[in-house]
Structure formats: C-alpha cells, structure tokens
C-alpha cells in the first residue's frame, strides 16, 4: 500500500510522490532501461580527458572546476561553444554514480562545479605503469568492434554459432586483431591487470626461489616487468605471438620470445597464465596447460591469474556482478571463452596432469591460483 510523501523539488514548490513497492520497482526498471547512457558517457569523458583534468587539479589544490574551466584545460580544446553546457550534463550523470563530486553552483561562475572522486585514479590514462588503468578497457569494450558483436547475441542464442565471427566475417578475436592495427593497439593497452599483479605481490610469495619465469601469452610483457622489478634475480621470458610482441617495450631481465602456446612453450621453473584461460574453451585450455606441464620441472607450477565465478548469483554482490559481466564479455567476444568456478579450475588442472590446484589469494577481482605439477 502506498503513501504520499511531500518532497521539495525546487525552492518554490512541493510535489506529492507516491512511495510503495511498485513505485520502487518501476524506478529500478526505468534505470535498467536507460542503463546504456552511463557507460557511453564514461567512455566519452575518458576520451576527452575529463578525469585526468579533474584529477590533476585535485592533486594540486583539491579545488572544484566549472565545466567552462574543464573545457579550457582538456587536451583538445573544444571548438563547440556549447561544450561547457554539454560537459555539465555529462558530469552531473557521473556525479550521480559517485564518480565525480558535484559542488554547489558558484555565484561568481554561474555554473555547477566538479571535483574528482578517489575512484577516478583507476581511470587515468597516464596511470597504467603506476596502478594500472581501466580507461582503455572502457574504450575497448565500447569500441564499434565489440559493439557490433553484442548485436549478434540474440541470434547466437537462437541459432548457435559465434557472436564475434558473425559480426566480423567469420574471424575469431585474435585473428581479427592481426588485421586491425588500430584495434590491436588499443586492446593491448588495457592495463588494469598490472594493478592486479602489483596488489597480489603485496602478499603472494610464490615467485621466491624462481630462476626462470615464463609468461605464457604475456602480451607486451608488462606483467614480467612488474615481477622482475621485485625479484631482480628472475630471468623473465615473455612468450606470445609475433603480432603481440611487435608493440612490446624492453624491460630489465625480460626476454621477448615469439611462438604459439598451442604448439609448445619455453621451459622455465614456473609459468604465468594471466587472464589467458578465460579466452578459450576447456579443450583449448587443456592443450595450453599440457604444453606448460611438459616444459616445467618436477616441482614446477603454473601461476594462474583469473576471475573465479561464485556458485550462486547473489543479489547485490559486487564480485558476482563483475564475474557475470566478464563472463558475458567472454561469451560474446571470445569464441568459447568463459569465466570459471573453483570446481572448473580444479577440473582443468586434473585434466592437464597437475597434481593439485591451490587458490592462494585474491587481488581486486582476480584470484592467484597455483597449478602444481
């Protein structure tokens, strides 16, 4: 049963609002129906450099900026005279999600003012080597290459097949990247896993005593760069396809080696598989893991860095939200890819010849899992 609440919506009026369960559900439904607005505004704000601009100002003086001031400080100065008005509309949406803070309208400026919230540091473009950045991840997720794939979801459910292949002439994601240099470069810039590795190294001790560490599918090599900076005695071998290594910078103690993990893997005392297994089917994962097993000594191990899905879909659980969001990304963008549960990782380890699977610690949304020979 509903009741009336007089809520002041402006300085001049009071409007009765009906509050009941149905009204609350209706509000939630409307929010879901319009959910596309937030990520697209987030993407545009990142591309414009809004977060970097606000965060730089907050670091210097902890002060608020008006949309006009923000526009004047962007990396690319807007030619549109209405840019401050449009930025204000974007920023107030971001403020409603606690991404930025909205201050009172300044009488002198005649505009709302905004300041970066702490969460902004995870979206700074220039922060990849420090804590990692989710900026590129957002931009990749809403690039036309991925958006076109999402449009295939209904047909894949009804008819089967591969969503990415349907959208891109039958090609799989990693084959496609070999044909699109722009997207490949953008994809390889996604850097938040560096934050995961740094966070894990605060507590994970599993690299002590390792002499040769192979990062299988290591991309541009930044993971080994981080590990080698803490353990300078380690010789790192960053192993990936030639096209992935083309953009790899040099890191002290790290050698880049080209090859195919489905054929063989360089030998080492230990190996890293960071966000690799979720790209592939169970059968493909077993092939990769068996090649790792062959190249390890008797006491060797594979350090798997992956998200672990909960067994139940709990309402309001942020880890479940992230896990199932990522699982749908794998479903649409990687042919046969998926996020896995503890039981599924244990099954992969056993099928590949490893004696046991140990879940060591969690860093942000990922787990550090050891597959021991």
From Swiss-Prot:
Keywords from the UniProt entry: Methyltransferase, S-adenosyl-L-methionine, Transferase
Induction: By the green peach aphid Myzus persicae.
Metabolic or biological pathway, per its Swiss-Prot or TrEMBL entry: Secondary metabolite biosynthesis
Entry GO MF terms: O-methyltransferase activity; protein dimerization activity
GO biological process: methylation
UniProt xrefs under InterPro entries: COMT-like, O_MeTrfase_dom, Plant_O-MeTrfase_dimerisation, SAM-dependent_MTases_sf, WH-like_DNA-bd_sf, WH_DNA-bd_sf
Active site as annotated: 278 (proton acceptor)
Residues involved in S-adenosyl-L-homocysteine binding: 217, 240, 260-261, 274
EC number(s) given by UniProt: 2.1.1.-
Keyword Metal-binding tagged: no
Pfam family, one: Dimerisation
Transferase is among the record's keywords: yes
Family assignment from sequence similarity: Belongs to the class I-like SAM-binding methyltransferase superfamily. Cation-independent O-methyltransferase family.
Subunit-structure text: Interacts with B'GAMMA.
Record-given protein name: Indole glucosinolate O-methyltransferase 4
Source organism per UniProt: Arabidopsis thaliana (Mouse-ear cress)
The encoding gene: IGMT4
């Amino acid at each position: 049963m509903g009741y009336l609440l007089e809520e002041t919506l402006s300085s001049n009026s009071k409007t009765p609002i009906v509050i009941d369960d149905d009204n609350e559900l209706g509000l939630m439904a409307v929010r879901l129906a319009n959910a596309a607005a937030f990520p697209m505004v987030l993407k545009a704000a990142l591309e414009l450099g809004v977060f970097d601009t606000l965060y730089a100002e907050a670091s210097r003086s902890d002060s608020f900026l008006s949309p006009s001031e923000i526009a004047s400080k962007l990396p690319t100065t807007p030619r549109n005279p209405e840019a401050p008005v449009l930025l204000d509309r974007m920023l107030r949406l971001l403020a409603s999600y606690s991404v930025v803070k909205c201050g009172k309208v300044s009488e002198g400026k005649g505009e709302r003012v905004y300041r970066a919230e702490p969460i902004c540091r995870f979206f700074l473009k220039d922060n990849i080597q420090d804590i990692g950045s989710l900026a590129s991840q957002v931009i990749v997720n809403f690039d036309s290459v991925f958006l076109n794939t999402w449009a295939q979801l209904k047909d894949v459910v009804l008819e089967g097949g591969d969503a990415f292949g349907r959208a891109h002439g039958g090609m799989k994601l990693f084959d496609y990247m070999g044909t699109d240099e722009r997207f490949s470069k953008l994809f390889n810039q996604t850097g938040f896993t560096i934050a995961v590795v740094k966070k894990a190294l605060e507590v994970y001790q599993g690299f002590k005593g390792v002499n040769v560490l192979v990062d299988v599918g290591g991309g541009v090599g930044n993971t080994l760069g981080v590990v080698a900076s803490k353990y300078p005695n380690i010789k790192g071998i960053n192993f990936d396809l030639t096209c992935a290594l083309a953009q790899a910078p040099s890191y002290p103690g790290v050698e880049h080696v080209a090859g195919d993990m489905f054929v063989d893997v360089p030998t080492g005392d230990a190996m890293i598989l960071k966000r690799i297994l979720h790209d592939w089917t169970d059968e493909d994962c077993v092939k990769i893991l068996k090649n790792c097993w062959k190249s390890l000594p008797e006491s060797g191990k594979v350090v798997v860095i992956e998200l672990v899905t909960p067994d139940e879909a709990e309402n309001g659980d942020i880890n479940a939200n992230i896990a199932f969001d990522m699982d749908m990304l794998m479903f649409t963008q990687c042919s046969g890819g998926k996020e896995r549960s503890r039981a599924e990782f244990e099954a992969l380890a056993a099928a590949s010849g490893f004696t046991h699977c140990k879940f060591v610690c969690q860093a942000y949304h990922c787990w550090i899992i050891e597959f021991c020979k």
